[in-house]
Amino acid sequence: MSKVPPTDPFSHMLNGNLQQRIVKRDIDGEVPTERAVTDLASEKAHAIATHGEVVIQIQHSDTFGMDKEKNDWRSRAARMLYIESRLVREGLSESLAMFFFMSLLLGCAATARFTGNQNDPMLAAFYHGFSIIFAIYVAGGISGGLLNPAITFTIAFLGRLSWLRCLIYMSAQYFGAFIASAVVYLIYYDSLQNFSGANKVDETGANGTAGIWSTFPRPYLSLRGAIFNQIFCTMLLTIGFLSICDFRNSRPDKGMFPFAVGMLIMTVFLAFSYSAGAAMNPARDISPRLWTLIVGYGDEVFSYNNYKWFWIPWLFPYVGALLGGVIYEIFIGIHWPKDYANKHVTNRT
């Protein structure tokens, strides 16, 4: 197989013959290992170009990892439940991973609130970062685990994701966050009632719990300061995320990618969450906020600060992400040598 320069530095896939040899070549041009991939003709091999290497991902076309000749209940169930549409599979992947992420994040936030540690920035940064790490591991092999509508939209804007996929991913992310909010609320229902009673929304009070679900600014924060905070945080997040994803840059190994993203979120959150919570993720804020409105927190979750807050952590992460994406492209992305990919990513039969 001849050299194939990846057209997309973030998620290039090659449909190849199942009996092929993939040469792993590191950034120095050396060839440390060779790997032959052989499997059933019903399977597809996708070569995913990452930082200096080609990784093989096997996807079963109709047996979901089970032998066609088997006819036990597991094989029958797998064949019945398997979804042919890759687009649908990716949407389900994003939805489940977002549910996983938000379940961990909201559960940790609730525990911090109940134990009086809600104002500990290190603790909040820790559970934000590690929640996203494990969530990306859930979906990384299927959809990439973007888990952020603002970043998803930006990647589509940069031409690295189709607009149809963008719409499906974003819908799945909002949906997963909403369902996670409902589940965590039901799990902690008795604790919430015991802790807050009728005083749910008052974030200045001792027993308010609205801050478990959504972000709220400091009372002194101006409208201008709140907007700039959301834009700047998400801009930094996006620049860091794109640099981690770009195989032409110092991208971490595939298994370390979620950890790198989690450390990035942890650092940005720790640096800039004091004033307004550093949502950086529209689905992380608006989906739980909508759930709290439904279950009786009242319209104060939207009317807080005379309706001069709820739309800020929802709208301006999109602005910050777009700004970060454009900045990364202008300063880094467009300046790689055109033949860079050919020098470092090679397929051979």
Curated annotation (Swiss-Prot):
Residues the record marks as carrying a glycan: 194, 207
UniProt induction comment: Most abundant aquaporin in early embryonic state, adult active, and adult anhydrobiotic state. Expression is slightly up-regulated in early embryonic state.
Residues passing through the membrane, by range: 92-112, 125-147, 167-187, 225-245, 256-276, 314-334
Keyword terms, alphabetized: Cell membrane, Glycoprotein, Membrane, Repeat, Stress response, Transmembrane, Transmembrane helix, Transport
Topology versus the membrane: Multi-pass membrane protein
Disulfide bonds: none
UniProt cross-references to InterPro entries, sorted A to Z: Aquaporin-like, Aquaporin_3, MIP, MIP/Aquaporin
Keyword Membrane in record: yes
Motif NPA 1: positions: 148-150
Record's subcellular location: Cell membrane
SUPFAM superfamilies the UniProt entry points to: Aquaporin-like
Domains (record comment): Aquaporins contain two tandem repeats each containing three membrane-spanning domains and a pore-forming loop with the signature motif Asn-Pro-Ala (NPA).
Family from the record: Belongs to the MIP/aquaporin (TC 1.A.8) family.
Alphabetical list of PANTHER family matching this protein: AQUAPORIN OR AQUAGLYCEROPORIN RELATED, AQUAPORIN-9
Protein name: Aquaporin-4
